[in-house]
Structure formats: C-alpha cells, structure tokens
Amino acid sequence: MPLPQDIRPAFQHIQDSLVRADEPWIVQSPLASRKVLWVSRESGSWAVLIHWKKGYVAPAHKHLGGAHAYLISGKLQVRDGVLNAGDYVYEPNGVLHDATTALEDTTYLFICDGTVLYFNEDSFTGYTNWETIEKLRENAKLAQAAE
C-alpha cells in the first residue's frame, strides 16, 4: 500500500551526524579536552564527549536548558555527591552547580539542550552553547588542516 503522503525531508541538506572514534580530541587546557559529537542549529542542543584529568575543576555554572550526563569512566565530585563510571544524571533547566571536580581521570557524554552560564561571586565569566561548541569544532579543524 502506498504512503498517503510524501515523507521525503523538506530540507535536502538534512543528514546524519557521524564522528569517527579516531577523530582527535580538542584540548582546551592541560587538564580538559572535548570531542564534539553533534550540534543542532535548529534547537540549540549539542552533544560532546568530555575528558577531564584528575584534579580538573569546572567552575560554578547554571544550566539554561536541561542536560544529560553519562559517566563512561572515572569519578566526579558534584554538588549532590559523587558520580561514578556508569552513572547517569539529568540536570534540569535552571539548576545551579558549584564547582565540579574530577576525582579521577574522567570521560563522560554530555548532551545539553541550551546554554551553560559560568559565574563567580561578582559576575558572569562566560558561557557555552551550540555556537561556542560549533566554533570550537571549526577552529580545531582549521588548526588540524594547517598542520
């Protein structure tokens, strides 16, 4: 029986997102690296693999969209206690986090539905969103091509 309507994508540029296992990590500091998996310009969502070496401290931040985290390996100290390899956490829109510390070398999958806003006692210090993640990926590709 034929389909009652045309189900082809309305936009021909729609495609899957594929990141190979051997794609290089983007080093952000001596203790922190990321691998960009997916960025959605349409929704503002993004997904990354994050690797923190033992002792890395992520600054205080607020989630301006829900986020999912799944620890692949390692251990993190978070406001609610300790997350271990195999743990999953959902962080709702609006949640505040104090500093998060890598108690061991840690790798985790992070999927975010918006902006993460960083702050200290006095002011906002920065943010991460789909645009900053996309720029991070583009700059890494340019740097790799220049090598």
Question: Where do the model's predicted regions map?
Answer:
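Conserved short histidine dyad/triad with adjacent acidic residue
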Residues: S29-K62, P92-L96
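Residues that flank catalytic or metal-binding motifs in active/ligand-binding sites
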Residues: S33, A67, E104
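Short acidic-glycine-tyrosine-enriched beta hairpin
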Residues: Q77-T101
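Short, well-ordered beta-strand segments in beta-rich or mixed alpha/beta enzyme
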Residues: L49-W52, L71-G74, A99, L109-F110
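Glycine- and acidic-residue-biased ligand/ion/polar-headgroup-sensing regions
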Residues: K54, H63-V78
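A short, N-terminal "cap"/entry segment at the start of jelly-roll beta-barrel domains
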Residues: M1-G44, F124-E147
